[in-house]
Each structure stands twice: as structure tokens, then as C-alpha cells.
Amino acid sequence: MKVSDRRKFEKANFDEFESALNNKNDLVHCPSITLFESIPTEVRSFYEDEKSGLIKVVKFRTGAMDRKRSFEKIVVSVMVGKNVQKFLTFVEDEPDFQGGPIPSKYLIPKKINLMVYTLFQVHTLKFNRKDYDTLSLFYLNRGYYNELSFRVLERCHEIASARPNDSSTMRTFTDFVSGAPIVRSLQKSTIRRYGYNLAPHMFLLLHVDELSIFSAYQASLPGEKKVDTERLKRDLCPRKPIEIKYFSQICNDMMNKKDRLGDVLATAQRIRRRYNKNGSSEPRLKTLDGLTSERWIQWLGLESDYHCSFSSTRNAEDVVAGEAASSDHDQKISRVTRKRPREPKSTNDILVAGQKLFGSSFEFRDLHQLRLCHEIYMADTPSVAVQAPPGYGKTELFHLPLIALASKGDVKYVSFLFVPYTVLLANCMIRLGRCGCLNVAPVRNFIEEGCDGVTDLYVGIYDDLASTNFTDRIAAWENIVECTFRTNNVKLGYLIVDEFHNFETEVYRQSQFGGITNLDFDAFEKAIFLSGTAPEAVADAALQRIGLTGLAKKSMDINELKRSEDLSRGLSSYPTRMFNLIKEKSEVPLGHVHKIWKKVESQPEEALKLLLALFEIEPESKAIVVASTTNEVEELACSWRKYFRVVWIHGKLGAAEKVSRTKEFVTDGSMRVLIGTKLVTEGIDIKQLMMVIMLDNRLNIIELIQGVGRLRDGGLCYLLSRKNSWAARNRKGELPPIKEGCITEQVREFYGLESKKGKKGQHVGCCGSRTDLSADTVELIERMDRLAEKQATASMSIVALPSSFQESNSSDRCRKYCSSDEDSNTCIHGSANASTNATTNSSTNATTTASTNVRTSATTTASINVRTSATTTESTNSSTNATTTASTNVRTSATTTASINVRTSATTTESTNSNTSATTTESTDSNTSATTTESTDSNTSATTTASTNSSTNATTTASTNSSTNATTTESTNASAKEDANKDGNAEDNRFHPVTDINKESYKRKGSQMVLLERKKLKAQFPNTSENMNVLQFLGFRSDEIKHLFLYGIDIYFCPEGVFTQYGLCKGCQKMFGLCVCWAGQKVSYRRMAWEALAVERMLRNDEEYKEYLEDIEPYHGDPVGYLKFFSVKRGEIYSQIQRNYAWYLAITRRRETISVLDSTRGKQGSQVFRMSGRQIKELYYKVWSNLRESKTEVLQYFLNWDEKKCREEWEAKDDTVFVEALEKVGVFQRLRSMTSAGLQGPQYVKLQFSRHHRQLRSRYELSLGMHLRDQLALGVTPSKVPHWTAFLSMLIGLFYNKTFRQKLEYLLEQISEVWLLPHWVDLANVEVLAADNTRVPLYMLMVAVHKELDSDDVPDGRFDIILLCRDSSREVGE
């Protein structure tokens, strides 16, 4: 029978159904057709619907395949058959997953259900509570079972490859679906993919006797019949036959082609029954696990790694048969364990490790490095801190001991390394995994899957170290290892923290490091802390910040290697020994690097000059550029991309993208420059690195040392600062920026070394001193100097960026340097023309007009002609003719005779004379009659050689200079370059600087650029012709957009000056001649930009959003540029919103209901959370009644409990008068000055009362009648409930009340932070379950909590102060 067939059923009587529940015989079990699967469910409660008259049953789906709908309450109608006096209901197999706590702290019931479905492909198998812990082992250590699966498949591949003609083996690797042999395609990638599918079945085989599921499964089979593979496939109902196929086939080979999986299960059942008969099942059940594990080990060829007590291979039947012959059979089959004897450590282990890693010629750098390696490897000191200069070789201090530990066969050590930034992960894993000496994997694998039994070293970042999942796994290490590996010889080795000074110096990240204090440091054999910039004071504070005791009070010399007598207290309580190699060696660090401090007009321009010069001298070298902001990083990358290959990184990129880009720069030899913020200055080791350039005006001494320290073998470090703009200020408590002056002296002061100010040897690699530099570095400096002199003499002014780079608009920069190929070609032509004019004038035009043409020919053509093209006849000619008469004739007469006449004699005869006759008619004849004969004719012949004659004749009449220069752009380039090369200027012509172009060509290029930009934007934002919003652009579904939509967000949401410039296009904020909007565009780019800004606000608190507005300052006047910047991280923002607002969507979409009883903190800390729904409503109406009587200003009251009077507000007849009353008393002004409303436009809050929130207003006004009925039902004197404007004032006041928000989010655990007013208003209208399970709107609960914070006027008690006191509640804006 089906419930959906209404013709066979009729409504059930409530009383009859209630009695039927007491008599189970009257109930008919029926699968629910309301579910996607036919899953039996359980009746939890039922009630009679007054409207429909149906009895409705509340039931639970506990095993649904759709995880999002698991444990969801479903209401179905109960029907009774006309011919059958029995009721249809729904039941469920035990146990009840929702009832009672699961005896495992790792898994929740939903995950258990997923585990069961993954393993068995069914939902209705019975298992007891002991099975929970067994099944949890799979999730805790999935990595271990994955690794075993990989080994199984590799072993099978080897067998099949060795016996290709064996039909049985080939049948093992034949896909029964397609019938095609797949052994040939079973490559490494395929092995790993199928290994993941095999892992659950591998787990089953190893734990076959520990699960009661198999007992129930075998008990359902008739007699002692074995189950063959095909029967198993049918019974387990696999959705993917490939999973069962591989498992059954591999079991076939493993069990000597005799046993099948069904045989294993049947054997397990027979052994269990025999043991049960003997009454001693519990001790002997473990023997099957030992037998199965031993078979796997032998079959995989791992006998050398494990020691078993078996003398020969025995199958399950042998075990059963042998039971009768021996009563103590369980004593003969012992648990598989690793070899117990421990191999001793020796100093020779370190030397052997070094030879494995670096070859037979390995030697330590110095005696200090040798002794430290021995200290770490041999000594019992539980915690060691090392400070060594950058480039010293700190990595080898733990790398060699790790290799030595891995060589020991008695114990498996698992160690962990943590670095501060994601960008260092790739470099660390490449370095530590080279030569195959260590098995290295990311820490994320350990956190998600557990220890795989193979990895020697896990590498992660500080965030992984502070994560709860990591600390929990370390806390449960002993239990996990014992249950998974059947041995206690897998131990935790070293905990290594690199650059640990960041715990103290990274002020903005210190809140993220709080979880490290929960880590069980005592579980590790040793903790090692390394840094190049951690003096004693910094090191001691950093260690105490993560929960350790700190440094030993007495500084320990490296030569004092005596062992400590008191190690019983554990690592966390024992002081850390500090080895300060910098003080021991008494050498100032970074002396091998040439450090140059330069003040320049334009940092990017100077940096580009240096980089081009470096790559001219050393084409295979690499460089790092450290910028001050993330915006500057992207802009430099865009503008420099046409000169060399660039990789850029900053903190806003995703973790995977950072790792990928860092790895690309380290491994790809063609990559030249790495541009990033300061995160690229720590820990990266690049052999080809020869230059570091720092553009950050706020570098502190640690950032400087770390950046210069990247130059391991010497090189050049440039600190470029803009003139008169050095920022000498602290950043929120961090170290102050470095000062102008000697860098070496500041480094000495930081490390506590003796000052040599004013003494011999003060300058080491700085201030022009080269005495301590290597010969290669000195040679590089000299070659750079010679190249700079050659550029100066050749008059090659490289203008890579505008001089006002920092002040210019970001979008203009991106439009100029980061456009399409067509734009790039335009720039190249412009630069080529400029260089052509420069070289042509130097060789030919030198004798034309003035003596300064030789030196300033580029500026003459680029600036004067463009600017004064119309006035050339009147002003330019007159001025230059004066100089021509005075100086040029004297100076250039020799050059004209020597070079120009010889070169241009042929062209002068045919073209120039006839051409210039028209040219000199009006302008040149009068002034240059003396020079025309000698210089003008020869000059024109050079510039108008073949193709410009016709154009010159027409245009020279008005301005000879401008037209001639314009026409030589196309025709003279080839000849000019040849002439320049003949003159010996080939070296200078390799550079093509960007210069200005004349006005006419600029207009043509500008229009082309606008059209091109318009097409690109239309392709990037194709749906702007429709009613598109930024959430659609990010990829959200329509049902999600409905609740996340940004109601009330318009241009007034933006702060003053952000996308609000006047006199420009309203759609794109560009000049009308450069407008990129297109016809038919309904949604402007400006609107998309302010919506994108609102999305960023969704993800940031007040302080973070304020900093973000400062970061995007270059885009304040460029919404199109900001949209491009926003779209780069489109996927990351989408994921962030999905993660941060999952709870919000679940609540607003009514998929989850807030219950105050689920909030433990609320029940303990607030009387409101123990009130009934009736009491909450009474309190709500009482608050509004008091406000109305006292004529209190509503918004101000809910903002900070200030009971100011505002009679006009209560007497207002419409919204306009209401808002005017608020503005008159200064409410909006106080709101902006006291709260985060100041981060929006001045009219933003005011306009919330006008056209926004229409749907919510309609919904609220419809509910006013319900409020009146509630007051009558409660016996309260009916009072006028607040109208919409007063109600909205309440919500706005609560939203900007920081004290109230913090308290509510603390008490009500189901909600989190929202940072947009429309989301807050929407959230306030959801319903919550009060303590008596009655529903009340959330805003009523908010008002009750707000009232509780202000007074003791609540029923049955007063407020228990937990977080905030009443005195501090007045400080709203702090």
C-alpha cells in the first residue's frame, strides 16, 4: 500500500490513532513516500491539525543519502484504509541516532551514518554502540588505510605485469562491466584514485571480527553456506561496482586464490560461534584480527618491517582445524608488533645523514653547526631555541637529525614542522623531501586523515598548529596509534617551529595563535624553535605567548652541553635553552650583502631601472621586490610584465594559490622577479637570487634583516624611499620603522652587539664600504655602475611609470599598463617612435635647429612639438632660429660636413629640395634663411626620405616640426635604427622607454582604447543588460540571493569620496570622453562596485573594514578598476560567504529553528532565556508602552539606553516628519560619530526610512493585527504597537549598539555576526522557540535582552553579569 493513494484511505480519528499507538498490532509499517529513498522512519510526536482535520506525525529521517536533509523534521498525514481497520505509521530500526550521546568524542551521528553508507551502500544495517568507536578509527586514520590500499594496488600491478599470460590473473584485472583488460591503464594516478575507493573495504578486512554488523549479516544466511563474490555484490547493493570489483579481486589473489570476501566473513562467523560455545569468546576474538593482519603483511611483502610469531602461512581453515589440537591456541597467535629492541643513537648518524643528503664530501659549516646538530639529536633537553643569522643553515640543524631518526628501524618517528606563511610551504617541502631521505606531507593530511604510517615529517603553517583538530589528534595520539597500528612503537618525534619570533612581533595575528596554548607539548620528544631575528627578549616573550615557560634565566653557552637533571616536569614546564650563534660568533649579520639606501623621486621607476640593468648583466638571475601594499604589488606586476616574467603574491590570495605561485618562482628558471608584501621575505631559499629591492617606507628592523637574508651567497639590496616622505611611525604597537642612517649600526643595536659608531669597521657592506663583500658581489656592483654610466652618457631616460606614481589614479595605471595586446602594441610603438626621434636627431637633426638638440632631441620631439604643434611657426621657430644662428652653425658645421652631407647627399638631391621649397615659404625663410642652405635641407632629407614627402608638403605650412616628427613615426624607424646602430648606439637601443605622444595620435589611440576597454568589460560582465546584482555575479543561486540580497544598499552606503565624484559619468565615474558604459546597460558598473563593497563589508568587522577602505584608496575614484580588482578573488569571496553565512541562510530559509534551550550560555547567564514566550511578549509590550508614555527617542534609547525626549517623533503623522524630527535632534549625527555608521555615507541611515525594506515593512504591517490579538490573549491592556518607522528605529539602534550585539551573540549560540543592516533586519524577524517551546519573533527576544542589560525589571530574578557590566554598557562607540 502507498500513502499517496488517496482513494484507498480516509482521515484518521485522533483518539483512535492515539489508542492505536498503544496497541502496536493496529499499526501498519509503511515506507514514507515523502522521502527521496524508501527509508523506515520513527514516529516522534503527532498532533491534530485544526484546519485540515488530519493527524500529522512528526518523524525523523536518519539515514538519508542527501546529507543536507538528514535529521529533518517531516510532517506527514496519517491515513487509515477503508477496508482495513489499521493505521499507517512509520517505524525505524534501532538504535536511535538522535537519542543519547555517542561514546566517541570524534564523530557525530551524521558522520556515523555516512560511514555506514560508504562501507555498505545501505542504511538499515544494525550495529551496537561499540561499533561506533571501531568505525571512528577509519575517519581518524583514513590516511593510513589509504596508504595500505595504494600498496595493495601497486602489488597487484606488479603481479599482473609479471604474469601477463596467466588467465586467472588477467581475469582479476578485467572490468566485468566492459570486459576490457585494465591492467595496462592502471598507472600511478589510477592507483591512487582507486586506492581511496578501496580504503573502506581495506578497513573492513582488518577489523572484520570487531564489528557486530558481520555477525548479524551472517546470521541472516541459511546454515553454513559460504557467500560467493557475486552474492556479496548483490547483498551489498553497490552503487559503483568498481569498488567491490577491486576489493573482491584483490582478496582473491591475497587469499591464495582460494578465499573470497564471503569466505572471510563466513570463517569469522564460524570462529565466533565456536568460541561462543566454549564461553571464552572475548579473548579469542582478537586472534582473527592477528591472522588477517599477518596475511596482509606477508602478501604485501612487509615481513622485514614487522615481526610475527607465525612460523608459516596459515589460512582461516587451518586455524579452525588447529583449535581442537591445542587448547591454548590463542597464546600461539600473538598480536603483530614491531621489533621491540631500540637501536642506540650515535654521533655518526648525523654524519651519515649529511652524506645521504649532500654527498660523500659533506662537511659542516663550522663547529657551532656540528655541536648544535648533536645537541638536538643526542641530548635530552626537551626544548631548544636557536638564533642564527639568515643564510646560516638553520634548516640543516633539524633536517639531519630527522634523517637520522628515520633511519632507525626500531621506532617510527613522526615529526612536525610549522612555518609562518603559506608561501613557505612549497619551498620547505621541496627542500626537505629532496634525495628521498624523508617522506614529507602537508599537515592538512594529518588533520583530515590521521597518521598514514609512512610519512616522517608533516609540514604546515601556524594556523594548522593552532587548530583544534590538530591539538585533539595530538592529545589522542597514544590511543589512536594503539588501535590503528597494533603497536606502541610509532611515536611523536620533533615539533619544529621556524621563525618563531612571529608569535610576538605579528601583533595583528596574535589572536590566531591562541589555540597553540592548548597543544600537549609534552607528547613530543623535543621542541625546536628557530629564528634569525629573535633576541632573548623577543624569544622569551614569544615562547610564553604560546604557553611555555620561556627561556632559562641563565643564558647557556653553546659549549655547555651538560644534560639537565630535572626532566620530570615535562617539556611545557621546563625552560627552553637558548643558543645565540650571533653573539657567540660576535659577527654582525648580513655583512656579505651590499646594502644601498637611495632616496628617489619614483620608487617603481628606479626599481625597474635596477632590474633591467641586473638582467642585462646576469640574464639567469632572479630578484625579489617588496612592496608596501597589496594594491601596489598588483600594479607593479601589471606594468613590469612586458619587460620580464613576473610572479606576484600577497596575503589576499588563497592558500593553494600562494603555494602554487611560490613553487613556480622557485622551480621555473624563466621567472625573473617575485613581487610581494613582506611575507615573501621570510624563509624562501633561491640559489639564483641576486637582488632584493624594498619599496616599503615602513619596514622595521626584523623585516629588513629577513629580506636581506634571502641573499644567501651575497648580492645587492636596495632600500628605495621617496624624497621627503619617509614614514617614521609605529604600526599598532609593532617595532618602529628603521631610521635613516647606517644600516649596520641598527642591526648591531637590535642584536645587542657592541656598537662601533665612529670607529673603524663601523660599516659592513653598507654606506659604500666593500671590504667585507665577496669578489663576485664586488664585480656585480662594478658592472652595475659601468652600465649606469653608459646609460647616462647615451641619454637614455627610462620612464617606466609616471613620476607621481603613488598619487595617480589606480585605474589609469592599470588601463595604461595592464590592457590588452592592442594597448601593449600601442605603447611599444610610442616608445619606439620616441627612441627613433631621439636617435635620428642625435645623428641627423643635431645640425638642424639648436645646439641642445644633441642632448635634448627626445624632449624636443616628445614635449615641445606635441604641446606647441599649432604655435611652432610663431614661437618655436623663432626661438630655435636664434640659437641656430648663434651656436648651431658654429658647432654643427663640422658635423654637417663630416656625417650628414655624406649620408644624405643622395636624398637631398631628389626629394628634399623640392619638398622644402614649399615648407620654408611662410615660416622658415624669414628666420632661417642663413641656415636653410646648410642645415635645413640636409635635416629634412633625413626625416622625409621616402614616404613623408607628400604629407610634409601639405602639413609643413603651419608647423614644420610637428608634422615632420609625426610622419617620421612610420617611415623613418627602420632607417633610423640602422643609422643609430652604425653610429655605435646599438647597446642603448635595447631599451624602449615609454614617453608621451602628440595630441592627435593620442586622441586616436584613446578612442581605440576606450572601445577595447568597453568590449572587455562587456565580456567580463555580460549580464549588466539585465537586472544583475553582485551576488549573481559571484555565483549564488536564486533562493540564496533572496535572503542574502542587499536591500537598502545604494550609493549612500559608500563613504564620502568613494565612487562619489561629480562632473563625471554616473555609470563608470570616468570623463565623458573616456566613458566605458555601453548602450542598453541597465546595471551600471558603479552600482556593481558599491554592491561589491557591501559584500566585502559582509566579511569584515568594523576595524577590518576600516583598514580595507584604506587599502582600496587607489580605487576610490575608479569603480571599474575596483570591479576588476574584486573579480580576481571572486571564487574566494563566494566560498567565504558560504562558510560564514551558512548559519544565517539556514535560519532565514526556515531550515533551522532557534531554540533558547539549546544555548547553554544563555540559560546560565540570562533570565530571559528561562522565560516563557508569554513573559517575553509581555516584557516587549511593556517596554514600548513605557517609551510611548515618556516620549523617549527610540533610536537613541536602543543605541545606548539614553532616555532623551523627542515628542515630535511620536506625534509625526508620516515618515518624512518622523525623519525630520530625528535629524532635528541630531540623532543621525550622533550615530555616525559614536558607531560604525561613520563608515557609510552621511545619508545612509537616514534613507533607510524611505524607500528601502518594502517587503519587510509590508510583512510587519500585516502582523500588527496579530500583535493586538496577542495582547488580548495575554490579558494585557491593549496599547498601540509601534508603527514601522519606530520599529525600524529600534532595529537600527540595536544594530549599532556594540555592547548589546556582543552580549546577544554570546548568549544566543545559534547566531553569529552580521555586518550589514539589511541582514540584521531580516534576521530579527525570524521566529525562535522560547523556554516553553512557544514561538516568538527574535526582535522580541532582543528587546528583552536589551532591557535586561539596562535594568533589573524582569520576572523571577535579575540579570547575571557574565561578560559586560552596566557601567560599561554606555560606552557604545569605544
UniProtKB/Swiss-Prot annotation:
Which SMART domains does the record associate with it?
A: DEXDc, HELICc
Q: Where is the composition biased (Low complexity)?
A: 832-975
Supply the source organism's classification.
Eukaryota, Fungi, Dikarya, Ascomycota, Saccharomycotina
Q: Which GO terms describe its biological process?
A: telomere maintenance via recombination
What is the induction comment? Induced in absence of telomerase TLC1.
Q: Where is the Helicase ATP-binding domain?
A: 375-552
Keyword terms, alphabetized: ATP-binding, Helicase, Hydrolase, Isomerase, Nucleotide-binding
What does UniProt give as GO cellular component? cytoplasm
Q: Does the keyword Isomerase apply?
A: yes
Gene3D superfamilies linked: P-loop containing nucleotide triphosphate hydrolases (3.40.50.300)
The record's comment on protein family reads: Belongs to the helicase family. Yeast subtelomeric Y' repeat subfamily.
Compositionally biased spans, kind Basic and acidic residues = 976-999
Q: What does this protein do?
A: Catalyzes DNA unwinding and is involved in telomerase-independent telomere maintenance.
Q: What class of enzyme is it?
A: isomerase
Record SUPFAM superfamilies: P-loop containing nucleoside triphosphate hydrolases
How is this protein named in the record? Y' element ATP-dependent helicase YLL066C
Give the species this sequence originates from.
Saccharomyces cerevisiae (strain ATCC 204508 / S288c) (Baker's yeast)
Positions of short motif DEAH box: 498-501
Residues forming the Helicase C-terminal domain are 609-758
Location of the region described as Disordered in the Swiss-Prot/TrEMBL record:
321-345, 832-999
Q: Which GO terms describe its molecular function?
A: ATP binding; ATP hydrolysis activity; helicase activity; nucleic acid binding
Residues engaged in binding ATP: A388, P389, P390, G391, Y392, G393, K394, T395
E.C. numbers: 5.6.2.-
